[in-house]
Amino acid sequence: MDKKQRKVVIVGDGSVGSSFAFSLVQNCALDELVIVDLVKTHAEGDVKDLEDVAAFTNATNIHTGEYADARDADIVVITAGVPRKPGESRLDLINRNTKILESIVKPVVASGFNGCFVISSNPVDILTSMTQRLSGFPRHRVIGTGTSLDTARLRVALAQKLNVATTAVDAAVLGEHGDSSIVNFDEIMINAQPLKTVTTVDDQFKAEIEQAVRGKGGQIISQKGATFYGVAVSLMQICRAILNDENAELIVSAALSGQYGINDLYLGSPAIINRNGLQKVIEAELSDDERARMQHFAAKMLTMMNVAS
């Protein structure tokens, strides 16, 4: 990314892709934003809608395009994918979305793209790992949203439980984006004070908070059909950190190289993000039990990936 032009390509203009585009145009100075989707009419409508947003914010060339448009992009964001069907196994979902991913990643790489991939398609940790495998890119140039959304939900749950502002909560969810995620209770701070000095952190408290975090997505889906605003902002923050060379500490699906005793897989962890992508993984302190749980899921994840690939 030595050039001055700032260009992002979004693949997938569904609810997440569209919401992300809106957040990106609001919050990042771009020269060019390209939307790639099979349903071109919808993408063209989004372009027209986003042009009006750009008139209030930043001068941006927004248009629909093809995978070939990625050749000079800084970032390709992949939000495309299919949701899990009733009764469908996790492996079946992985197989379906891996095929979709392959149909995207190969032509993007063939275009000459030399930037960073950012992934939000689910299951995000596995599909981020698969993107790196399919692309052959260095691990630091492939990043997923990981447990960033889980972390946001944790902050909201704690803020509501303790009657404080979300900005007063410093907390993280690690590992898998999903039911195997790990709430790092020992490291939570409320107004710069350890959580255990603010309230009683017993098994009941932990269970209530974990349920609030893991159950929120299902609640939203049952009420409005899908979740998309939170992950859209997560994507925006990652892209902004890359475009602005922020060296920002974010929770992402990061390539692990020995951290937490795990190698060659992507899982949720704090990391430093800058113009080169993932600059550094910050290994959070975990108890022996939490570390074992994370390693157990990593082993399952590797098995599923090897079967699917």
From Swiss-Prot:
One of its GO terms (cellular component) is cytoplasm. The keyword Calcium does not apply. Pathway: Fermentation; pyruvate fermentation to lactate; (S)-lactate from pyruvate: step 1/1. It is found in: Cytoplasm. GO terms for biological process: glycolytic process; lactate metabolic process. Its EC number is 1.1.1.27. Substrate binds at R90, N122, P123, V124, D125, D150, T151, A152, R153, T227. GO terms for molecular function: L-lactate dehydrogenase activity. The active site is at H177 (proton acceptor). Keywords: Cytoplasm, NAD, Oxidoreductase. It catalyses: (S)-lactate + NAD(+) = pyruvate + NADH + H(+). InterPro entries: L-lactate/malate_DH, L-lactate_DH, L-lactate_DH_AS, Lactate/malate_DH_C, Lactate/malate_DH_N, Lactate_DH/Glyco_Ohase_4_C, NAD(P)-bd_dom_sf. NAD(+) binds at V16, D37, Y67, G81, V82, S103, T145. It is an enzyme of class 1 (oxidoreductase). It holds the Pfam family Ldh_1_C. It comes from the Bacteria. SUPFAM superfamilies: LDH C-terminal domain-like, NAD(P)-binding Rossmann-fold domains. PANTHER family: L-2-HYDROXYCARBOXYLATE DEHYDROGENASE (NAD(P)(+)) (PTHR43128), L-LACTATE DEHYDROGENASE (PTHR43128:SF16). HAMAP family: Lactate_dehydrog (MF_00488). Homotetramer. Belongs to the LDH/MDH superfamily. LDH family. NCBIfam families: L-LDH-NAD, PRK00066.1. Catalyzes the conversion of lactate to pyruvate. This is L-lactate dehydrogenase 2.
